[in-house]
Amino acid sequence: MAEVTFELFGETSEGKEVQECTLKAGEYTAKVLTFGGTLRSFMVPAKEGIRDIVLGCDSVEKYEEQSRTNYFGATVGRVANRITQASFELNGKIYTLVANNQGVNCLHGGINGFNRAVWEAREENGALVLTHTSPD
C-alpha cells in the first residue's frame, strides 16, 4: 500500500490551484498533478541509484504552455488519438470539432481536453483517486 500526500504545486493562469499528489511505496515514488491528471515524476531504483524516468516540467505555467501541443504524462480525452478532419458522424448528424493537430485533425480531445482540466484528487485506501466531470 502506498503513502499518499498532497502539496500545492501552483496555480493555473485562471487562478485554479494545482496540487501535486505524491505516492510513495518502498523505493518507488510517483508524483501526479491535478492539472491534466499528469504524471510529473516517477522515481525508480536503477544501477546508478534512484532515477526519475518521466520528462516533466517544473511549473504549472510550463505545463500550460506545452499542453497545447504536447501531452507529456497527461491524461488525454475525451478521445485518445486523432479524429480525422476534425469531424465525425453520429446517428446521421455531423459534428465539427476544433482542429488542433496539423490544422486539420482533432487530437486527444481538442484544445480544452482532459489534459488541461484541473482534476479533483483524494486518497482512498492507500491509492490516489482522480476525478473529473466533463460537461456535455
Q: Residue locations for each model-derived region?
A:
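Surface-exposed acidic/polar loop and edge beta-strand patches at domain peripheries
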Residues: 1-136
